[in-house]
Amino acid sequence: EPLRNLAVVKESIKVMLSSYGFHLSPTAITVSTLGLPKEMLSLSKELPEIQIALSLHAVNDELRSKMMPINTKYSIAQLIETLKVMETLRKGPVMISYLMFKGVNDHLEHAEALNTLFVERKVIFNLIPFNPTELVSSEYQVCSRDQIQNFKAIIENAGFRVTVRASFGGDIDAACGQLASISGK
């Protein structure tokens, strides 16, 4: 979680943006987070043009807490309240990352719930197909491309911008979410 080391992350971003660093555009930088409200607000205030991606992956606290234990500390409702404040500090929308698992969080009712949760919020949804790996056992399964497209259509029909992350490197266990050692650590 990069925001657990916020001071270093901020300084690194400033170097990447500077003329003595990489001279990147702020919109070329995305910081992904599990959702640490205080740190999200601090980052938004100090660097309002960079992209922030909130890893959500569920539409209710019960499921999100099972998938992401951090949710027991910061609920979905708290994160949405944080997003409301961030909108007053930031120049652009926050990305909501949503890793899709077959039969777990991919039901069309979940798409409708996302629409309800984020009504009137400035967000972009990034749907991420699950990439399994033989190195790490998982109870999760891959969603069909059709299911992801149907899910996407429901969110788009509510007026949100939605992307589906392209997956590369799956053939060598190097796609998003697949990086692990042979020991599974």
Kindly label every feature range from the protein language model.
Residues E1-I154, A158:
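Conserved AdoMet/S-adenosylmethionine-binding subsite of the radical SAM
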Residues N157, S167-K185:
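Radical SAM enzyme core and accessory elements
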